[in-house]
């Protein structure tokens, strides 16, 4: 078949999500860094499963590929986790962009050309929205798939054959990723995000192994022209202003003195898009009608534009501000003092922060994984503040936080982000936070303090590795400071000592060592380690159970 209808395409998406779920553990194992916290597979699994779960809950409102694109891409972004989840959401945003912007409300079928456009748009939007695109990742996969269509290398006549060629290119690219990123080649793995994206596409193709025929559900132009303006609408939180719809009889004029302009749909849509959003323009050239649907704060401008081309047969305007107001509770009165949303690996760290700093907006990540945009925004609600600082203990959370910052800006909430490399650095940053000062001053002070703080994490290497002339064998104890391996030793005690030596070079007058020990360390072992450190270095030491899964110790020196 050269087309696929809406219902079957949703099934293809479902199978793509399922294939990620079936392979996420292996994708995690492709993590480059020897720290065994590879979470690309988990992030992609959670991103897709949550977004698809939301899609299924709204399935009665999904009447077209445009509806599908709006719903699925919105939720992919909200539920995206980690770099892989956010980048995947941008690829899919591009994939659906043409469907959302140009498909009418009754388009329920995609053809070969639609898919070609979708894959080309996927590349364009993804590369545009990722500030520093890196080759050798899932971005490269979508770029080379897009190139096949641009160069007409993918000339498939059926959707099944088209996806077979897409997946062939995807896997060929995945295999080449070690040649594009030296760090992949050194570790003997392919890029985990690229692999995950290929798995998703392969899952979509598996649809054709289960069903032999497709249902032809495309509406004819005659059926399109019979659309009525009435109908159920699903209002989302982003739909404000006036929902304006009208049917225009082109060329008709009530006055012989007024000559109407010649209608050009592309130019008309361009003009409408300048004064409105959610624009849908459907024309029936045979009968000389055009139907317009758009959201605008100034419906009078939209009506005046239409009158340049003809006369109205039907007009309907709904105030979405009132509709949304009925669905929403009264707005919460927000405090102007800055508040913090902080991520930590475990409840042990969360308890410390609650007790010492009375902060309640805390996200624990060891069990739930990287925070999604949605979870960050939900945490903001707990603060009741209009000035927010995200304090994140992992650089991989930046993309999700950055998207949350963009959405908070639309909500007129001022926000910024302080990135640290581990939870002890976050604790250090909290010591200089002052709610009586503004966000800018606090962020500047916190970043400066963290920059001068000496800390490291210690774990066991999950694979052989080499970095900065440091040889790492599987099972070695390694220390990571400032996102780089600084120590590798066979024995844990020696690794701790060498790590402290490394950190002391950064601190002029060391007095205090703070340590959180993980689940693999008993209280007795931690106490013995504390005594050895105090005896060797003459430092005051505080050891606490952190209960973290990955790191045996997280150390900080002041």
UniProtKB/Swiss-Prot annotation:
Entry-linked Gene3D superfamilies: 1.25.40.340
InterPro entries in the cross-refs: DegV_domain_contain, DhaL_dom, DhaL_dom_sf, FakA-like_C, FakA-like_M, YloV-like
Disulphide linkage map: none
GO biological process: glycerol metabolic process
All residue ranges annotated as the DhaL domain in the record: 7-206
Pfam families: Dak2, FakA-like_C, FakA-like_M
Domain of life: Bacteria
Record-level Gene Ontology MF annotations: glycerone kinase activity
SUPFAM superfamilies cross-referenced by the UniProt entry: DhaL-like (SSF101473)
PANTHER family for the chain: DEGV DOMAIN-CONTAINING PROTEIN DR_1986-RELATED, PHOSPHATASE PROTEIN
Protein's name according to its UniProt entry: Uncharacterized protein MG369 homolog
Species this protein is from: Mycoplasma pneumoniae (strain ATCC 29342 / M129 / Subtype 1)
């Amino acid at each position: 078949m050269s087309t696929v209808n809406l219902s079957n395409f949703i099934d293809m998406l479902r199978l793509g999500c399922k294939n990620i779920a079936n392979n996420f553990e292996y994708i995690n194992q492709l993590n480059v860094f020897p720290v065994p916290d590879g979470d690309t597979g988990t992030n992609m699994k959670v991103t897709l499963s949550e977004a698809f779960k939301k899609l299924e809950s709204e399935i009665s409102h999904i009447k077209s590929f445009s509806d599908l694109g709006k719903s699925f891409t919105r939720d992919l972004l909200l539920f995206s986790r980690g770099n892989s989840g956010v980048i995947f959401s941008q690829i899919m945003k591009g994939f659906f962009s043409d469907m959302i912007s140009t498909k009418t409300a009754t388009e329920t079928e995609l053809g070969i050309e639609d898919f070609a456009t979708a894959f080309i748009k996927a590349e364009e939007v993804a590369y545009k929205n990722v500030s520093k695109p890196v080759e050798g990742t899932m971005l490269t996969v979508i770029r080379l798939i897009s190139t096949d269509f641009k160069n007409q290398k993918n000339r498939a006549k059926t959707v099944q054959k088209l996806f077979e060629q897409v997946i062939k290119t995807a896997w060929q690219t995945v295999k080449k990723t070690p040649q594009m990123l030296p760090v992949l080649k050194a570790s003997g793995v392919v890029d985990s995000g690229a692999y995950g994206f290929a798995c998703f596409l392969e899952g979509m193709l598996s649809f054709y192994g289960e069903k032999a025929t497709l249902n032809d559900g495309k509406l004819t132009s005659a059926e399109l022209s019979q659309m009525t303006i009435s109908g159920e609408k699903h209002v989302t939180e982003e739909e404000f202003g006036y929902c304006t719809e009208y049917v225009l009889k082109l060329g008709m004029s009530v006055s012989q003195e007024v000559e109407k302009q010649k209608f050009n749909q592309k130019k008309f849509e361009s003009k409408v898009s300048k004064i409105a959003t959610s624009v849908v323009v459907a024309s029936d050239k045979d009968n000389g009608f055009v139907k317009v649907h758009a959201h605008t704060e100034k419906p009078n401008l939209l009506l005046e534009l239409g009158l340049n081309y003809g006369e109205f047969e039907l007009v309907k305007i709904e105030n979405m501000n009132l509709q949304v107001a009925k669905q929403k509770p009264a707005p919460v009165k927000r405090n102007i003092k800055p508040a913090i949303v902080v991520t930590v690996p475990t409840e042990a760290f969360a308890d410390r922060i609650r007790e010492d700093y009375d902060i309640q907006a805390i996200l624990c990540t060891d069990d739930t994984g990287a925070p999604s945009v949605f979870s960050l925004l939900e945490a903001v609600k707990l603060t009741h503040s209009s000035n927010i600082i995200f304090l994140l203990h992992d650089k991989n959370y930046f993309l999700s936080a950055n998207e949350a910052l963009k959405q908070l800006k639309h909500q007129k909430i001022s926000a910024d982000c302080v990135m640290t490399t581990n939870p002890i650095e976050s604790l250090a940053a909290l010591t200089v936070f002052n709610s009586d000062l503004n966000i800018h001053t606090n962020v500047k002070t916190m970043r400066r303090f963290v920059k001068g703080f000496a800390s490291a994490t210690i774990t066991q290497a999950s694979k052989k590795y080499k970095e900065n002339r440091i040889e790492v064998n599987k099972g070695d104890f390694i220390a990571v400071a400032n996102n780089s391996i600084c120590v590798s030793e066979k024995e844990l005690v020696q690794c701790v000592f060498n790590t402290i030596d490394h950190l002391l070079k950064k601190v002029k007058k060391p007095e205090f060592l703070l340590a959180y020990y993980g689940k693999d360390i008993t209280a007795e072992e931690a106490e013995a380690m504390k005594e050895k450190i105090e005896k060797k270095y003459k430092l005051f030491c505080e050891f606490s159970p952190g209960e973290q899964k990955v790191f045996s110790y997280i150390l900080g020196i002041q």
